[in-house]
From Swiss-Prot:
Family the entry assigns: To H.influenzae HI_0162.
Official protein name in the record: Uncharacterized lipoprotein YajG
InterPro entries (alphabetical): Uncharacterised_YajG
Biological classification of the source: Bacteria, Pseudomonadati, Pseudomonadota, Gammaproteobacteria, Enterobacterales
Species per Swiss-Prot/TrEMBL record: Escherichia coli (strain K12)
Pfam families linked: Lipoprotein_16
The keyword Cell membrane is assigned to this record: yes
GO CC terms: plasma membrane
Domain of life of the source: Bacteria
Gene name as annotated: yajG
Signal sequence, renumbered to the chain: 1-17
Amino acid sequence: MFKKILFPLVALFMLAGCAKPPTTIEVSPTITLPQQDPSLMGVTVSINGADQRTDQALAKVTRDNQIVTLTASRDLRFLLQEVLEKQMTARGYMVGPNGPVNLQIIVSQLYADVSQGNVRYNIATKADIAIIATAQNGNKMTKNYRASYNVEGAFQASNKNIADAVNSVLTDTIADMSQDTSIHEFIKQNAR
């Protein structure tokens, strides 16, 4: 009886020790929504996203003398497209195809530079996101949003530490997008 319980328990602990941590980072920034503009009733915008980063990695970390590449848990272009759709809907726009203004949200850079030693780690995260507004009348506007975030901690940087840094810089960028009215003014001038 004792062997029937002990053997599976020992095997379980041995296998658990071999498990590698996941190589994805849970990207879930806080979405800030802007104030509604009641004068926008009926204005439709179309929205799409693009990820133009040269490398899809969010971070590269050395663990057990090997470089581990960490990627996002979901496609960033769809995440940011969803964010922009929520922000435009909150402002009072309708989102759909063939609007008088097309918005494209582009991820140019999102990366966490992780440096770690024996007792400390540093995570320097940068985001560079652009929104290109193109009106049917030919007018065009590009607005860039940039943010950076640095954090230090003890020992080794975990996936959660890196995810928190990435989510923090994305949350700051999304808040900037929400507070900025330049795209909103461009749409108002070119959608009528």
